Each structure stands twice: as structure tokens, then as C-alpha cells.
Amino acid sequence: MSKTVIAGNWKMHMTCAQARDFISAYLPLIKNVPKGRELVLAPPFTAISTLSEILKGSNVSLSSQNVHWEDNGAFTAEISPKMLLEHSVSYAIVGHSEPRKYFSESDKQINLRAKSAQANGLIPIVCVGETIEQRERGEAERVIRRQVEQGLEETDKKKLIVAYEPIWAIGTGKTCEANEANRICGLIRQWANCPEILIQYGGSVKPGNIDEIMAMSDIDGVLVGGASLDPESFARISNYKVE
């Protein structure tokens, strides 16, 4: 696994036609991305098959936006690791704040998803983060530590990514100060008890702040939302500059 992972989460955006147009514009802009910098896109499930074909031989990997812990069964609206592997998917996002919030996903369920992903050769991107209310009450560190310890239980921490996404910064235009994001990512590394673990930052990442974010010592990549929907914007993020 690369030491730096730049991932774009499209959420519930992009038809197959729009995904094709995006890739046509994006790929020419990332030809000179430095070696060792992994680029990842997490499209909606409907576009995975299309992108799997288009991206063959490129320097872009695919991620799913979720994955179930069973290989098959009566789990309406879910998708299994084996289904994803058929389409050359390499990563799986689990524990994003939106399914945590809207579908009441627990740390136990997220842990099951992460373990299932690893057991099938996928690299889980385990999302953690606090709400603004939790931060204002001084509970941020306790909440994130619980998510890390329970979400990563019985996993191989050298073969996964933790994405720190303060919920109050997702899609709001508010960005956690780079030094504070770096501090939390450093704590996550301690709580995981694995110096080699890869940690991303997510939360209103955009071309204007990517260079500062990636200059931080404990941040190994980013998980990008809205800014990953525009090929030029995501290309600038992919080509971030190192001082």
C-alpha cells in the first residue's frame, strides 16, 4: 500500500455518463503524479462497473462506499466484498459519518465491515470523527478514541486506512485547522498503537488548502468529498505540492 492515498468520495453523485466525462477530463491532468502517491475514486455502486473498465491500466484505483460483512444473503441494499472484487475494487469506505447518522451504524457493525473487507483482500478506509456538539463539550478525543479502538479491533492495522473527518467540517466549507487536524491524527496513531498506520484527513478539503494539509507530519492523505466531483479541482488536489 502506498504511503500517501488521495481518495475522492462521490457519495450519491454521478451517473455513468457523467463518470465517463469526469475520467476523460481527469486522467490527462494526473499523468505526472509522483510515484508512491495512490489515487482512489469511490463512485456510486452503479458506476463501479463502468469505471472498472475505463480505469484499466491507469494510475487510479477504485473504492466502494461501503461493504457488508457477509459474502451473500438477505441483506437488501447491501453489497458484498466478492461482488466488489469482480470489478477490480481495491478499497472500501466504512464508518462514514453519513451512514453512522442516517442509518445508526454502530462501531461494532463498522468493525465487522472492516474485518470482512480485509479478509477478502480489500483495504478498508475506516472513518472516524466528532460532531460540533461533542467538540464544544470537550468530548472529541474520547469519541474518536472509542471509534478507533472499537472500529479497528482484531484488524491488521498495517493494511487499512483511518480517515479523520470532523463531522462539522464535512460539506460545510469549514475546515479543521491544519495543526489541529494533525494533532488529532497523531493521537489516532497512538490510540491505534501502530506507528505505520496510514491516516487521512477529510472535511472540506479543496485546492486552496491541500498543500497545507499535506505538509502536516501525521497526515498521510485525504478523503475528499465535494471537491472530487470536479476533474480540475480533484486533479489539483491529486497533484498537491510539497515544499
Swiss-Prot record:
Pfam families according to UniProt: TIM (PF00121)
EC number: 5.3.1.1
UniProt keyword Isomerase, yes or no: yes
Keyword tags: Cytoplasm, Gluconeogenesis, Glycolysis, Isomerase
GO cellular component: cytosol
Superkingdom, natural source: Bacteria
Protein name: Triosephosphate isomerase
